[in-house]
C-alpha cells in the first residue's frame, strides 16, 4: 500500500517538474528569439550598436531558474565606448535584477493579501525563496503613504444613515536603526453596518468596511483634536454625506475615545461590549455557582443600557478579599467614566451592533507578525501594513505596482 502511495506521489511530482521544465524551455526560447530579432534588426545597425559576443544571464522566474544567452553590444558616447544589452532593455530586465518583475509582483500581491513570509515561501517550494529575499523585494518597492494611496485610488461610497467608527490601540516591538522600540498602532475601522445579503446567523459580515491606521512611538504625544480631524478627513474620502450621517464611535473606554463628541459633533459614543464583558467575567466568574447569577444580572443590565441597575448591583458587599474589592471599585469607576458620555446607556439602542476592532487588530495587525516575539524593521512593517490595508480598502494593488515598477 505504501509503495502504491509513493508511486502516486512521484507520478504527480514528476508531471509537475515536467510542466515547469517545459515552461522554462519555452521562456528561454522567447528571450533568445527576442535577442536574435534585435541582433538582426536594421534599427540596431543604423544606430551604431556593435556586437561584442554573447553573455549568459540567470533570472529566477515563477517556474524556476532561467539561464539564457543574449548579445552584448558596444555603443559610443561622449566618454567613449560602453557595453549594453539591448534585449535586457527590451524585456524590461534591469542591470542587477535577479528576480523577474512578474515574480516580484506575485510576492507583493501575496503580502497585500495578508500572507506571511513562510506562507509565501510555501507557495513557491521549488524556488527556495528566503525571508531576506522577500524583505529585499519589499524594501526596494517604492510606496506612497497609506493616506496618499487612499486619496488617489479610493472610490467613494454613498452613506445612508449610519457610519460606524471602531477605534483601538495596539502595541508592537519594531526595529529602527537596529534597536527594538515599542510602537503604538492606532487602528480605525469604518463600516456601514452588517451586510444582510452576505451575513449568516453564525457569521456577521461588515458592509463597506474600510481601514486606516496611525503608527507612532509609544511615548509620542497624540493631539486628540488633530487625530479626530484626520479620522474625519479619511472618512470623507471613503464615504459621501459623512456630515449628515450619525457617527457611531466604539472603543475600549479610553478617555480620548469617550470624549469624541468634543471633536466630532454628530458622533455618538458606545463602549465596546468586549471590554465590559471581559471585566465582568474576571470579577464575577460565571463558572462559579455563587457568582454566576450576579454575572448574568450585570450582563443583562449592561446589554439593556441600564447603568443604574449595574451600579446598584456593584454597590453590594460581594467580597471579603481586599484585592477583589479594589477591582470592584475600579470597575464602578470605569462604569461611571463611560456613562459620562452615555457609553453604557447607549447599549440599548438598535444602532448598537457591537464593535469589531479587536478582531480587526488580530486579523490585520498581529496576524502579519505571526503572533510571536519577532520584531520587523519599522520601515518594512509599515510597507507591509500599507500594502495589506490598501487591499482591504478595495484598492487595485496591481495598478499600484505598475506605477511603481515602470520607470
Predicted feature descriptions by range:
Residues 1-29, 75-407:
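Catalytic center-proximal scaffold of phosphoryl-transfer enzymes
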Residues 24-99:
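Basic, low-complexity segments
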Amino acid at each position: 500500500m505504501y509503495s502504491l502511495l509513493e508511486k502516486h506521489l512521484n507520478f504527480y511530482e514528476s508531471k509537475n517538474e515536467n510542466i515547469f521544465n517545459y515552461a522554462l524551455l519555452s521562456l528561454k526560447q522567447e528571450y533568445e528569439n527576442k535577442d536574435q530579432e534585435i541582433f538582426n534588426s536594421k534599427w540596431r545597425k543604423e544606430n551604431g550598436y556593435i556586437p561584442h559576443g554573447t553573455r549568459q544571464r540567470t533570472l529566477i522566474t515563477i517556474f524556476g531558474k532561467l539561464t539564457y544567452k543574449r548579445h552584448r553590444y558596444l555603443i559610443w558616447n561622449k566618454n567613449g565606448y560602453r557595453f549594453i544589452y539591448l534585449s535586457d532593455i527590451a524585456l524590461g530586465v534591469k542591470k542587477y535584477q535577479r528576480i523577474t518583475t512578474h515574480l516580484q509582483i506575485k510576492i507583493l500581491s501575496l503580502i497585500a493579501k495578508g500572507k506571511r513570509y513562510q506562507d509565501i515561501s510555501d507557495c513557491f517550494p521549488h524556488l527556495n525563496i528566503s525571508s531576506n529575499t522577500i524583505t529585499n523585494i519589499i524594501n526596494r518597492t517604492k510606496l506612497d503613504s497609506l493616506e496618499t494611496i487612499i486619496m488617489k485610488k479610493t472610490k467613494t461610497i454613498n452613506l445612508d444613515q449610519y457610519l460606524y467608527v471602531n477605534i483601538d490601540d495596539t502595541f508592537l516591538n519594531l526595529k529602527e536603526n537596529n534597536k527594538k522600540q515599542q510602537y503604538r498602532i492606532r487602528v480605525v475601522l469604518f463600516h456601514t453596518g452588517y451586510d444582510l445579503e452576505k451575513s449568516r446567523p453564525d457569521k456577521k459580515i461588515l458592509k463597506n468596511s474600510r481601514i486606516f491606521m496611525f503608527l507612532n512611538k509609544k511615548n509620542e504625544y497624540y493631539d486628540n483634536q488633530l487625530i479626530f480631524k484626520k479620522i474625519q478627513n479619511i472618512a470623507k474620502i471613503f464615504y459621501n454625506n459623512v456630515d449628515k450621517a450619525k457617527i457611531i464611535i466604539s472603543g475600549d473606554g479610553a478617555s480620548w475615545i469617550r470624549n469624541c463628541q468634543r471633536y466630532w459633533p454628530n458622533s455618538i459614543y458606545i463602549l465596546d461590549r468586549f471590554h465590559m464583558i471581559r471585566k465582568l467575567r474576571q470579577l464575577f466568574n460565571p463558572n462559579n455557582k455563587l457568582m454566576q447569577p450576579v454575572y448574568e444580572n450585570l450582563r443583562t443590565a449592561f446589554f439593556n443600557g441600564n447603568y443604574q441597575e449595574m451600579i446598584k448591583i456593584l454597590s453590594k458587599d460581594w467580597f471579603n478579599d481586599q484585592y477583589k474589592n479594589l477591582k470592584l471599585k475600579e470597575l464602578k469607576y470605569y462604569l461611571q467614566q463611560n456613562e459620562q458620555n452615555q457609553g453604557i446607556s447607549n447599549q440599548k439602542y438598535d444602532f448598537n451592533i457591537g464593535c469589531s476592532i479587536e478582531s480587526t487588530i488580530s486579523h490585520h495587525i498581529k496576524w502579519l507578525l505571526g503572533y510571536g516575539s519577532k520584531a520587523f524593521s519599522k520601515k518594512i512593517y509599515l510597507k507591509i501594513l500599507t500594502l495589506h490595508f490598501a487591499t482591504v480598502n478595495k484598492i487595485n494593488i496591481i495598478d499600484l505596482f505598475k506605477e511603481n515598477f515602470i520607470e
